[in-house]
Amino acid sequence: MEIKDKVALVLGASKGIGFAIARTLAEEGAKVVLPYHSDWPEESDEMQKEFAGFGGNHLAIPVDLRDAVQVKDLIRQVQERFGALHILVNNIERGGMPVVHGSYDLEVNREQWDLEIDTTLKAKWLVVHNALPLMKNSSEGVIINVSSIAGFVGRSGPAGLIFNDGYAAANRAISSFTETWAREAAPTVRVNELMLGFFETRHAEGTRGWENLSGSEKESICKHTLLQSPGRLDDIVKAVFFLIKDARFMTGAVLRLDGGYVLGGEQVPVMPDGILNS
């Protein structure tokens, strides 16, 4: 799919991964819809200022994506403004960390479960449910569900310090949604999942949780990753653009971008003397 003049809805665009994706789409000539939440006022203000500087036809909309009525109105505004929707980057999540929040049954933590499930899972469903009819009527489309390896590894290994139970379960469900939506959206809309590991903008230096880990704990996460480091933001942007522009014959699939974390950091052992290595 060519990006120029296409309409793109990017969730989580006020900061981090979503902002980088939205900015690059705008630079490529897309008309970008930017939903934002009142929880992030400074980031949302900066986002709107930067996109105003790009020129072009972009739309920033305040919305709580966990609210069915507000999501329906969001898509209505997209249809009224642009008449089409071609690209949906379903990038919204809230994940608690055991090392930060502790158990769900702590008094200060009673709402954490609902926050993780409603934001990571319910909001994604609400947006696709409301956006898909418009996308199917827009000649061609692509949906990218951004998820986490938490759904694959759960609380195992060093990731057990980072991923809460509810967050991990919600991400496992996203893979099921991806397959279901791929069937519902075919043949005009492709639906794929981008499953992310540890990145400089996620659970790495300067982000919540990472500073609470000891040096040995940080080292164990990197050692558990075959490439022995967190990924970079531009790695994610490149993967998203591959799924939009080049993955013409790909739908219902999961593209895992984790530096080999899921494989456990275990390399092929050196064979004993006298046995040829491959």
What are these regions (language model features)?
Residues 2, 229-257, 262:
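C-terminal substrate-recognition "lid" of short-chain dehydrogenase/reductases
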Residues 6, 55-57, 84-85, 135-149, ...:
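Active-site loop of short-chain dehydrogenase/reductase
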Residues 7, 14-15:
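Conserved glycine-rich cofactor-binding loop
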Residues 28-46:
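Conserved glycine-rich Rossmann-like NAD(P)H-binding loop of the short-chain dehydrogenase/reductase
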Residues 41, 62-74, 110, 235:
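The beta1-alpha1 cofactor-binding region of Rossmann-like NAD(H)/NADP(H)-dependent oxidoreductases
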Residues 44-46, 102-103, 158, 198-224, ...:
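A glycine/serine/threonine-rich, flexible loop-to-helix segment
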Residues 94-97, 106-112, 136, 142-173, ...:
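Catalytic loop of short-chain dehydrogenase/reductase
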